[in-house]
Amino acid sequence: MTGDGVEQACGECATTLEPWEGQPAPRLYGFTARHVAQALVMVACGQSYRRTAATIRQVTGRPLDDRPRRSATGQVLAPAQQHGQLVSDWVEVFAPIIWSAYASARWPQWLLIDDTSFRITKPGRPRGEEAFSVLGAVGYGPDERPQLIAVEAVPVVDSAAWQAFLRSLKGTPGLVVGAGGLPLATADRVFARRRPPPELRRCQWHLARNLTKSLPDAVQRDRTDEIHRLIAAAQSSAPAWEQLTAEILRRTSTGGYLAALKMVTSLRPVVAHQLAQPLLGPRSVGPLEQFFRELSASLGPRASKMTNKVRADALLKLLAADRNGWTDEHAWADLIRTHLHRQQGHARQQREHTDSSGSPSLRRLPKPVPIDA
């Protein structure tokens, strides 16, 4: 009892209770909201579903057989204790609830957009084949700190995917920074009729990389060559850009710089336009690229098993939440309890978004072969 006579229950203590008693938990679940939150935090921090499931079963006193199993064909299977379906179901059901409690529903003033792809091994293909891609957006709030504001897995990166992604939130950003190509072109189409339309800015790091890759191979490897300093400074002012152009033009007479000359010529109007714009806001998609590198380390080894779009999106939201510094076991447990209270204790039905056999939602489906009549 509190001082004003209101009865309270501790949501964190875990005493041994009768089967009809216990801590707040989703109906028909054998685990409490606190344990679900603990599992979600572990997954957000990069733990696998299997390791998380084994830990949760152990700490709750619900261990399963920890001996390796074999299938009917003799294939070695993971122990039942490590079966990850338990945690995978929780991620699908509760990750969107956690994300919606923190993430903004509107685009911020400054926005970074880009995509990255995940590949899987394929016999006969040295680089494997593309499994799926991830679209990402980092926004800058009033404190000018970058935060992931949207992330989505797609089977293929095309204009339709980017249009749906950029229309997923309300509002219009004031500045959109991208590597160029499809993301910025689609942003121009989506936001062009908004008033005022956003400024579109090419990422300076990608522009510099394009220039560097156009150099002869030996010059690319020689980081002491003066031209690398000129490239680094080229986007700071019009005279710096002209100095780089003059140096490339001078070297063209010796051979091997034709590609660099074409590149610096084609990028000149882009750089000139950006130099004429206000200097406010980010100039690189670096914060988003950093998140993509972390994703590659976390999801790369299991990309071949990620075939369901809804579940992949839920996992991405947890990983993004951790990147934003939102992971908090106690706060997440409170969010889950509040959600369950509103739903009379019922969590959303698990496995609502299963794929039909042979039609994984996170894979590019093969084009149908025309049949002659």
Predicted regions and their residues:
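Short basic-aromatic helix/loop recognition motifs at nucleic-acid
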Residues: 40-47, 281-283
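Acidic/histidine-rich catalytic cores and adjacent linkers
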Residues: 35, 171-174, 181-186, 225-373
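Conserved beta-strand -> loop -> alpha-helix junction used to position metal-binding or nucleic-acid-contacting
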Residues: 176-182, 186-227, 289
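Basic, short loop/linker segments at the boundary and entry of helix-turn-helix/winged-helix-like folds
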Residues: 1-42
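RNase H-like nuclease fold core
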Residues: 8-9, 15-19, 62-178, 183, ...
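Short, charged amphipathic recognition helices of the HTH superfamily
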Residues: 45-58, 184, 241-244
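Short helix/loop capping segments that flank catalytic or ligand/cofactor-binding pockets
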Residues: 18-21, 51, 120-122, 185-187, ...
